[in-house]
């Protein structure tokens, strides 16, 4: 856990620049998420710099956006002018919220970088209402394309903590098995 936090603390200031290449994909994701969170109480786990939370907050009733990295949360708080959005440092394996307290939980691009993603999903299920919605998009890294292998090599070299390499089908199966 400490090693993972150190990676994200070291790279917090660069994260938004790194994510710019995926801007079009993220814009589409925001469009898809907004109607789901409309007037709902939302928890975003592993918010990073808060990109998703900041782009959907107008639709939601309230958002709690958390990350294990204090530096990521510092970056996330910059430019947050909404009283409906609160950022805090939290451990996704032990959330401080009451059971069944959120209508929607978002965990985006995070389950592949934690050592025990099924444990995180159990905690998410605990805080998600019975009729709640889990939004869990993630990058998949198991495809064997040459560009994918090159990207994985450089991510590994940079210390990126990739723990699960799923294909899209494997990821969906993982989510279904841990429902």
Located regions from the model:
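Conserved class I S-adenosyl-L-methionine
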Residues: 1-37, 51, 55, 75, 133-158, 162, ...
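Conserved acidic residues
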Residues: 40, 61, 103
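Class I SAM-dependent methyltransferase SAM/SAH-binding core
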Residues: 43-94
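A short acidic, Gly/Pro-enriched loop at the edge of an enzyme's catalytic core
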Residues: 93-104
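A short SAM/SAH-binding and catalytic strip from SAM-dependent methyltransferases
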Residues: 104-117
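A short glycine-rich, Lys/Arg-flanked "PGG" loop and its adjoining helix->strand segment in the class I
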Residues: 118-133
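Short alpha-helix
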Residues: 163-178
